Amino acid sequence: MSLSTEAKAKIVAEFGRDANDTGSSEVQIALLTAEINHLQGHFSEHKKDHHSRRGLLRKVSSRRNLLDYLKRKDVARYTALIERLGLRR
């Protein structure tokens, strides 16, 4: 199950430059992080759900690529974002 519309709107409002900013790297990374955290809870209960695990790994890879892009373009925004999201790095 993906995030609700309200949860997505809250993340966009928190990490976006304005209410309609859904394309910036920070917003995309924050949305992927929320979806990854949701799926991790799913796997604590459904350990053998390998089909969904593939989707999780795809989201993790996508987030990794966006983080690498942001780090290349603007290190200050990158470090601020990983601190706000609580990601290791």
Curated annotation (Swiss-Prot):
**Keyword Ribonucleoprotein attributed:** yes
Q: Which Gene Ontology CC terms are recorded? A: cytosolic small ribosomal subunit
Q: Which Pfam families match?
A: Ribosomal_S15
Per its UniProt record, what InterPro entries does this chain match?
A: Ribosomal_uS15, Ribosomal_uS15_bac-type, uS15_NS1_RNA-bd_sf
Write down the SUPFAM superfamilies for this protein, in alphabetical order: S15/NS1 RNA-binding domain
Please cite one Gene Ontology biological process associated with this protein.
translation
Q: Name one GO molecular function term.
A: rRNA binding
CDD domains (alphabetical): Ribosomal_S15p_S13e (cd00353)
- Keywords attached to this entry: Ribonucleoprotein, Ribosomal protein, RNA-binding, rRNA-binding
Which family would the database say this protein is a member of? Answer: Belongs to the universal ribosomal protein uS15 family.
**NCBIfam families (alphabetical):** S15_bact
Described function: One of the primary rRNA binding proteins, it binds directly to 16S rRNA where it helps nucleate assembly of the platform of the 30S subunit by binding and bridging several RNA helices of the 16S rRNA. Forms an intersubunit bridge (bridge B4) with the 23S rRNA of the 50S subunit in the ribosome.
Quaternary structure, per UniProt, is: Part of the 30S ribosomal subunit. Forms a bridge to the 50S subunit in the 70S ribosome, contacting the 23S rRNA.
Q: What name does UniProt use for this protein?
A: Small ribosomal subunit protein uS15
Q: Organism, per UniProt?
A: Proteus mirabilis (strain HI4320)
